Swiss-Prot record:
InterPro entries attached to this UniProt entry: Wnt, Wnt7, Wnt_CS
Subcellular location, principal: secreted
Expression sites (tissue/organ): In embryo, in brain and ventral neural tube; in adults, in brain.
Disulfide bonds: C3-C17, C5-C12, C81-C112, C97-C107, C111-C134, C130-C131
GO cellular component term of the entry, any: extracellular space
Gene Ontology MF, one: frizzled binding
Family: Belongs to the Wnt family.
Native species: Xenopus laevis (African clawed frog)
Post-translational modification: Palmitoleoylation is required for efficient binding to frizzled receptors. Depalmitoleoylation leads to Wnt signaling pathway inhibition.
Subcellular location, record wording: Secreted, Extracellular space, Extracellular matrix; Secreted
PROSITE patterns xrefs: WNT1
GO annotation, biological process: animal organ development; canonical Wnt signaling pathway; cell fate commitment; neuron differentiation; positive regulation of JNK cascade; tissue development
Protein name per Swiss-Prot or TrEMBL: Protein Wnt-7a
Residues that carry a glycan: N98
Amino acid sequence: QECKCHGVSGSCTTKTCWTTLPKFRELGFIVKDKYKEAVQVEPVRASRNKRPTFLKIKKPLSYRKPMDTDLVYIEKSPNYCEEDPMTGSMGTQGRLCNKTAQHTSGCDLMCCGRGYNTHQYSRVWQFHWCCCNCK
């Protein structure tokens, strides 16, 4: 919730508040954590009904229904490491990666355990002091 005060010279004679979403980065972390803990489910049909009546977690001997806060999926995600024309995935072969990064752009994760080739580049740049031009 965010609030803003209204009044003469900064006095808070009237206060207006409204509900806001969390910061985008925080929301991204929440969704990523949910994705890591997502549970596979399967639809269960009632004996007389043709439509699925509820979802249950897909594990042997498990009859627990997912909680309202669970992120659920019915089919597993495709393997994004390999090229798959059916899903439109180009795979990760030949992609540039960051050897020192620990997240998704890091070579260990992006190259899917296939290894990677390293190249070292050297560039010479002319230094330019910004925003000052002496007479």
